[in-house]
């Protein structure tokens, strides 16, 4: 296992805090895997759990589980290939329905580390899922879906994507910002591109001279997150239980979306 020197791991959590940030060393567990630093932050006021890290390949990932709106926002900052004439970086944003199996913010604020310098490997793999993001969001109007989107995705005004079934769930009222009394029609903040999306060729199959839109794929892998709470029987002789720990998981999501050309999806491979 390759080890990248890291700063001392910290946990900034008060006993009565509404916000807690746990900073840990993470590895995928593979023999040649790099170790990197990751923060997990629970905020009871905003009802969010943030997972943030910089991958060994230089991608900055922020995943926000918004329990109030019932969505997860994933921001990925990808460095550009300067020798190919690409921009220094580009930001992609994806909004998915649900908060997955992330434990709630209140539970995250109670997390502590016994061994801060340890390298964390998830106990369980939740596998790999494919997310077809065939619609785009108008970022400065997307507060009706989640109040956090305009801020998190502010650098992805043309590259914020959602799956069609998220739009359906918003229309059904199962997800969406609870702070705003008036619900806008989904068409106010989203644009469906499903007819074009189904006809796209993979960017990996295109040449750099091709300028038409193509289907791009980027992986969003979280190799360590608290996915459930553990309960133990009380020692006092009664039949009750108490929280006594967490179970940790890893999960990868293959984000598929429309890129305007191969030039903004140079990493795509088959």
What does each of the following model-derived ranges do?
Residues 89-139, 153:
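A eukaryotic "domain-to-IDR transition" signal
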Residues 18-63, 67:
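Extracellular/luminal recognition modules and glycoprotein regions
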Residues 3-21:
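Cleavable N-terminal signal peptides of Sec/SRP-targeted secreted and luminal proteins
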Residues 135-270:
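A eukaryote-biased signal for long
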Residues 52-112:
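An acidic-aromatic
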Residues 12, 27, 40, 125, ...:
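Intrinsically disordered, low-complexity segments enriched in small/polar residues
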